[in-house]
Amino acid sequence: MSALSVLYLVLPLPLVFILHDTEEAIVQHRWVLSHREALTLRFPKLRPVIEHLSNIGTKAFVVAAMEELIVLIVATCYVLTGGTYSTQIWSALFLAFSLHLFVHLVQAILFRGYVPGVLTSLIFMPYAIYGLWSIWLTTTVVDFLLMALCGILFMIANLKFAHWLGMKI
């Protein structure tokens, strides 16, 4: 990975994550509680997810976000050391995070209004697109899809762990 890619793409990821999750942490719990009924009526199949999110308080959310931030910081530092497969590991996490930003935009469209995280998703979408394009240009299609799949699977597993951890503390 070039020095400019590290400077413009790798190093900002933890900060972008912090800013995005700060928006979510500030409004998530109150927003879900105040929109729970409307969400359940509009999306009845998502009732278990809505109930789960209703039970995650701000403290639990912040603990979960801190765990995720540690993962991103470790991956970012690993890139800086030039470790084996560090670029692929970081790229997988970046692809998953970029998908997460895109999901917020889709949620806002489906909800037809504000959802927690959508403002920073809009602000950071150019960064995500730049990163996706940079990764796309430096890998094969198969590697790109494999990193995306690994990143998404890791994100799902880690999110479950992070939420569990947040509820325990």
What are these regions (language model features)?
Residues 128-169:
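Terminal transmembrane helical module of multi-pass membrane proteins
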Residues 18-25, 97-108, 152-168:
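Transmembrane alpha-helical segments that form the membrane-embedded catalytic/substrate-channel core
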Residues 25-54, 169:
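Cytosolic, membrane-interface loops and tails of multi-pass inner-membrane proteins
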Residues 95-104, 115-135:
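Hydrophobic alpha-helical membrane segments
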Residues 1-11, 75-89, 129-146:
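Helix-coil boundary and interhelical linker segments in multi-pass alpha-helical membrane proteins
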Residues 2-29:
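N-terminal signal-anchor transmembrane alpha helix
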Residues 26, 46-66, 107-111:
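Membrane interfacial helix-start motif at the N-side
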Residues 58-80, 123-129:
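Core segments of transmembrane alpha-helices
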